[in-house]
Amino acid sequence: MAAPQHTLADFVTDQWQRRSWFTWLMWPLSLLFGLIARIRRYGYQQGWFKSTRLPMPVIVVGNVTVGGTGKTPAVIALAHALAEAGLRPGVVSRGYGVKLNHPRRVKPTSKAADVGDEPLLIARAADVPVWVFPDRALCTQAMLVSHPGVNVLLLDDGLQHYKLQRDFEIVMFDTRMGGNGMMLPAGPLREPLTRPRDATLINDPNFRATPDKPDVYGMRLELDEAWQLNDPTMSCDVSKFADKRVLAAAGIGHPERFFASLRQAGLSPATLPLPDHYDFVQDPFADNPAALEADVILITEKDAVKCERFDDPRIWVVPTTPVIDAGLIDKIRRVVQARNPAIATPVTVGQSTATGMADGLDKEHQDGQPAA
């Protein structure tokens, strides 16, 4: 089966980067969306809706825009940094595209179809507990049953998940920033660009911090040695493929970011952008002309966790190492150290509580079983 066509999604994404007839056609709906978003956030701030305070500092990494900005590598980098600082971080994620009836532990041996591709990548890249469930407060409390030593939480893509109170919010952007600056559906914004946050993290190798913006930090993704999907012991620098016919494929939020990094490494690949979270149930390379002619097919780590069944020695995985400005790491450490993590019981404000969740889980759900 050929790679899926997503012309409509491409069209809308393109329109979100400018102000055009589409922008103004959607503008009335954007006003309504923006009003609802503001009321919702204000309602949680005022305690109209339930929200849970967990017995540990909560660090949120998220977007005000639709689409990928590099949250997953940022979470991995922060997990490593917090662990190196002597803390015991845990990660909670929604588990995008996965049907879950209860909180589930993500193990390095889990399947992406059971827990989601990004949580699985985090579990394999960072030696920390990773759990998934749409109700992140419930999920965290389940994690604490199995991992009572966790003393700081990283909430992956949870900026708009106000059911869970937080101590530090990181809003991420990439080179597209806020697009045309308009709310959905006229633009890519889930919330206004002016939304308060503790830090802004920009995934851009050319970003440079300036003194006039002390809470804006940069992140870059450095390419590591590629490894062969069928035999991970085989590795080489991606520059070795410069004289090969290369196809680069990516099912991430912004595939062009991956393609551009390969060009910067000296490659001139044909490209195959796939929808974000593409499941690879159908082989996108089977009858793609560029794939059939390619000597080498390069994919991302996020896609690799879904391609393990492919028996094709041409497929190589290109990992990246996220590098975050040290100033952001230091600021997070200060926030974590300022809060006493030894709170015994979650405190809930608003209409109801998630306290007591752990008692409602049977033993096999508490320890993450059945294993995914």
Curated annotation (Swiss-Prot):
Keyword Cell membrane (UniProt): no
Pathway(s) per entry: Glycolipid biosynthesis; lipid IV(A) biosynthesis; lipid IV(A) from (3R)-3-hydroxytetradecanoyl-[acyl-carrier-protein] and UDP-N-acetyl-alpha-D-glucosamine: step 6/6
Reaction catalysis annotation: a lipid A disaccharide + ATP = a lipid IVA + ADP + H(+)
GO CC annotation terms, alphabetical: plasma membrane
Region (Disordered), start-end ranges: 351-372
Keyword Kinase (UniProt): yes
Binding site for ATP: 65-72
Keyword tags: ATP-binding, Kinase, Lipid A biosynthesis, Lipid biosynthesis, Lipid metabolism, Nucleotide-binding, Transferase
HAMAP family, per the entry: LpxK
Family: Belongs to the LpxK family.
Protein name: Tetraacyldisaccharide 4'-kinase
Organism: Cupriavidus metallidurans (strain ATCC 43123 / DSM 2839 / NBRC 102507 / CH34) (Ralstonia metallidurans)
